[in-house]
Amino acid sequence: MINLKLLESNYENFVSKLRGKNINEDVLKSLLDTFNELKKQRQILEDLQAVQNSKSKELGALARSGGDVAGLKEELSKNKEALGAQNEIVRTLEEKLDNIASNVPNITDDDVPFGRDEEDNVCIKKVLNPREFSFTPKAHYELGEQLGWLDFERGAKISGSRFTILRGEAARLSRALVNYMIDFNSARGFELVNVPFLVNSNTLYGTGQLPKFEDDLYKVRDEDLYLIPTSEVPVTNIYNDEIIDAEILPIKMTCYSACFRQEAGSAGRDTRGMIRQHQFEKVELVSITKPEQSEQILDEMVACASDLLASLGLPHRHMLLCSGDLGFSAAKTIDLEVWLPSQNKYREISSVSNTRDFQARRAKIRFKDGKKNALVNTLNGSSLAVGRTLIAIMENYQRQDGTIEIPSVLKRYM
């Protein structure tokens, strides 16, 4: 959630930055007007409460002295009614404010380029040159079906579209990738954690998936439980509503999980193969930091994911996302895109984001800063998406006869 006090004091800056995320100024004006009205009504409530307290003391003193308390009792009764009505006004405004604020995205960092969509993202680095093939490279789904690695037909029979069964060497390679990624991230100082794949609505609110993106989530019927869209959600919320000792910051964690997404806005996109699935696996990085640490930690997380790709011999590039392509909670995001020979282009395989204090404000994650409590910064990123890494290896390491070479760093994990 954005800082409403900063919105009040720096309104034009918020309007400018959120315009880049396609937020109309009318939304911010409504938010600020509601915030100011709530402050006004809270002051009225406090004044009424002060009167109630004062009159109650006066009544007690008058009763002890044997004076006539009838008139004062009537005043207290009327003031109590006014208090009740004012409480309802404040409660309604608080609900309205939360409804507006919880749907407003994070503002962008100053170095995020203004743009409309992915066409306006900026390439800031390329790592490894794409391989030159002496034959026409096949797509991963062609290779997978020929080798008996990927069973799309039976996956669809069991679960429907956008589900795949990995068999034999593909299943082993996928498991090898998970173990290698965990070991690689752990060696960079990220603590391995294992979390639930089902979380409640408060948890999803904390990281920004609810209420805005409920249509993309799988909900358990008649329960306040959802399947996680990414392990960023439970891992970040490990510290939900906690005050962390500043001495242990930054906290750096890595986590393997299955992820589940409706892909509600992806109809007709990537319908063949494993690029876009309802269920997929990912190894995630999450960091919780002091505000002054988060830019350095973002660089470290990007380097970790990039070095992991490089260790697998996979050509990729770093993309600084423009304002219009940024996620809801992100202030700044670096995407890593891996080269896919069959498509002759780069595709996203990791997205590393700094959310500043946006998620921390929603999830109430604080640290002890001297004598006062302050909000942490939270960061998250894939290191890496397992299925897309499998795809990239299949396509970049394919031989002319349709077999797949296994990257040397993975052989001991197979």
UniProtKB/Swiss-Prot annotation:
Statement: the UniProt record of this protein carries the keyword Iron-sulfur: no
Record key words, sorted: Aminoacyl-tRNA synthetase, ATP-binding, Cytoplasm, Ligase, Nucleotide-binding, Protein biosynthesis
Annotated binding of L-serine, by residue: T230, S231, E232, E284, S382
Top enzyme category: ligase
Binding-site list for ATP: R261, Q262, E263, E348, I349, S350, S351
Catalysed reaction, written as an equation: tRNA(Ser) + L-serine + ATP = L-seryl-tRNA(Ser) + AMP + diphosphate + H(+); tRNA(Sec) + L-serine + ATP = L-seryl-tRNA(Sec) + AMP + diphosphate + H(+)
Main location: cytoplasm
GO BP field: selenocysteine biosynthetic process; seryl-tRNA aminoacylation
A molecular function GO annotation: serine-tRNA ligase activity
Compartment(s) of residence: Cytoplasm
Family (UniProt): Belongs to the class-II aminoacyl-tRNA synthetase family. Type-1 seryl-tRNA synthetase subfamily.
Quaternary context: Homodimer. The tRNA molecule binds across the dimer.
Function: Catalyzes the attachment of serine to tRNA(Ser). Is also able to aminoacylate tRNA(Sec) with serine, to form the misacylated tRNA L-seryl-tRNA(Sec), which will be further converted into selenocysteinyl-tRNA(Sec).
Protein name from the UniProt record: Serine--tRNA ligase
